[in-house]
Amino acid sequence: MIVGLHAVLFTDDPVATRAFLQDTLGLEPVDAGGGWLIFAGPPAELAAHPAEGQPHHEVYLMCDDIHATVADLEAKGAEFVGSVVEQRWGLLTKLRLPGGGELPLYEPRHPSPLTS
C-alpha cells in the first residue's frame, strides 16, 4: 500500500537548500542521520501527463493565493525567477533555490483531489 510521496531536490548546496526549506518555506525536518534532513511536506497529489520529448518528472509547490504567498516568501528572503504568469491550469511562478535550480510554485485553477 502506498503511504506517501517522497521527492528529492538535488542541489549544489544542500546546507543552504535545507535552511531555505526550513527557515523560508517553514517545512519541519526530521534528522535522518548522516547529515540528511527529511522535511514533512503538505498533502500531495500526483498527475500523469503526456510527455513532450523525453519522459521526465517535475515537482511543484501549490498555494491557495499566489500573490500573498510570493509576498510572504519575499519578505523571508526568497527570490523568484520572473513574475506570476497565467497558465490554463493556474497561476505560476518559480522560486530560485539557493543550491541552484528552480522550484515552481502555483495556485491551481483545476479540480484537485485534495479539495474535492
Where are these regions (language model features)?
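N-terminal beta-strand motif that seeds the catalytic metal site of vicinal oxygen chelate
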Residues: 1-18, 45, 57-59, 109-116
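Vicinal oxygen chelate
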Residues: 4-12, 38-40, 51-116
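Conserved active-site tyrosine of GNAT-family acetyltransferases
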Residues: 17-22, 73, 100
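Short secondary-structure junctions
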Residues: 25-32, 79-83
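Conserved short beta-strand elements that form part of the metal-binding/catalytic scaffold
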Residues: 27-57, 95, 102-109
